[in-house]
Regions:
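OB-fold (S1/OB) nucleic-acid-binding surfaces
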Residues: 83-104
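Internal transmembrane alpha-helical bundles of multi-pass membrane proteins
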Residues: 262-431
Length: 431
């Protein structure tokens, strides 16, 4: 045999081997094209998002300054500042010709503005100026481009559109019903039900933050779920298309009622997409819905990326989607009773999801939250579920009857507050 030759047998490839190799090749190509498409889409999205961010940050440079006289609309509900002192003031955000300006009002103007809510308009005069350098970045994330000073407010107001009037009528009725509770309990109740934390004292805010319960006073998916559950007896009687329209209306109404906070925007957007997919018969994974909502919302409003509530809500939702079931199986494998395993898995998953944004925003993560949530969330959930209709009924009753109707809510709210205070003390001992 000549040198350099290789002895052996020729093996003919079978059709099955060739088909398997062809399938593997096509599968590899398919995955390559899929990854390439994903990278391309993400790159285009990031470029577009950067351009949107630059446009939003530069928008304040073109805001008109100087004297103003005309119609201004409240963007948010006015906030009472230094309520305990004689020099109390009212802080309000007005929209003037499409631009947002913040004003701090005193005297008669403060008293007139304090009685009104977001969406209502009034004729005023004032001086438009730039925001201080220390507050410029923070105000820009709220789309506030300047400060309004020397404000004089007229006494005649416009109540806004029919939708605004209806929403504000509900909020005033809720405030009347909540007034049947002591002041601090009323402030916490409104925070649990509609996310209105304007009147919560600083010690209450710190207690909920230190105990890992601050998410309870930020309206999110849990509140959306409870509102839809309360409306379910009516929605389930409708035909599919009518049910879809009614559900979207309920979501829009609750979003406006809660003043479109970042957390409720995320929750309402996810609920709307889920309802649309369900009606169309599509099966979409929850994580994909979350990613679509986050991407869509930050493109529409890039300033959401600087809102802590938005990232805490998104992080908690991601934690629940990805980690809740594995953690539940883990706790069950450790012989934890099912009655405890599920809420413990839910709490742990949400805490893990919010750990990073909480640390970046507040510089700390409260480990006591794993325990406090087990005691506070079930009672807070009951308050969220029945609190809205009960408070509306109490608001339409006399003071004595309203007090009786709101008595269960008083016990529920006080329980949640006690858990927060005890959790705060335990957190300080652990520090």
């Amino acid at each position: 045999m000549p040198s350099g030759t290789i002895r052996g047998r020729f093996v003919r490839s079978s059709p099955g081997v060739l088909m398997g190799q062809s399938y593997e090749t096509r599968s590899a190509q398919w995955w390559f094209h899929r990854v390439l498409l994903a990278v391309l889409v993400c790159s285009v999205f990031m470029v577009f998002l950067v351009l949107r961010c630059q446009a939003e940050w530069k928008k304040a440079e073109y805001a008109p300054m100087g004297s103003f006289s005309g119609v201004a609309t409240l963007v948010a509900d006015p906030v009472l500042v230094n309520a305990a002192s004689r020099s109390s003031a009212v802080r309000a955000v007005f929209q003037l010709e499409g631009w947002r300006f913040q004003a701090t009002l005193y005297g008669g103007s403060a008293r007139r503005v304090a009685q009104h809510l977001a969406g209502e308009s009034v004729y005023l005069t004032g001086e438009r100026g730039e925001v201080s350098a220390t507050q410029k970045h923070r105000r820009a994330t709220q789309h506030i481009v300047g400060q309004l000073t020397n404000v004089q407010v007229a006494s005649t107001w416009s109540d806004g559109s029919a939708f605004t009037r209806a929403t504000n009528r509900i909020r005033r009725l809720l405030a009347t019903g909540a007034s049947r509770l002591p002041a601090n309990e009323a402030a916490l109740f409104l925070g649990l039900v509609i996310g209105d934390d304007r009147n919560q004292p600083r010690e209450m805010i710190n207690a909920f933050r230190d105990s890992g319960l601050s998410h309870l006073t930020a309206v999110s998916g849990q509140n959306i779920a409870f509102v839809l559950a309360a409306a379910a007896p009516l929605l389930t009687r409708m035909r599919p298309r009518a049910r879809l329209v009614a559900t979207l209306f309920v979501l829009a109404w609750f979003t406006v009622l809660t003043r479109a906070e970042p957390s409720v925007l995320r929750a309402a957007a996810m609920a709307a997409i889920s309802v649309l997919c369900f009606t169309a018969g599509w099966q979409v994974k929850s994580l994909a819905v979350l990613a679509l909502c986050v991407a869509g919302l930050v493109v529409i409003d890039p300033m959401l990326m600087w809102q802590v509530g938005f990232w805490m809500s998104s992080g908690a939702t991601a934690g629940l989607i990805v980690l809740m079931k594995p953690l539940q199986r883990f706790f069950q494998s450790c012989h934890v009773p099912g009655l405890i395993a599920q809420p413990l898995a839910t709490t742990t998953a949400a805490q893990i999801g919010t750990a990073l944004p909480m640390y970046m925003a507040f510089g700390r993560v409260s480990p006591i939250g794993l325990i406090t949530n087990l005691f506070a969330v079930p009672i807070a959930g009951v308050v969220m579920l029945v609190g809205l209709p009960v408070c509306l009924v109490a608001g339409m009753m006399s003071a004595g009857l309203g007090d009786m109707v709101m008595l269960p809510m008083r016990f529920g709210v006080r329980w949640v507050w006690w858990v927060a205070v005890i959790g705060q003390r335990c957190a300080k001992l652990m520090a």
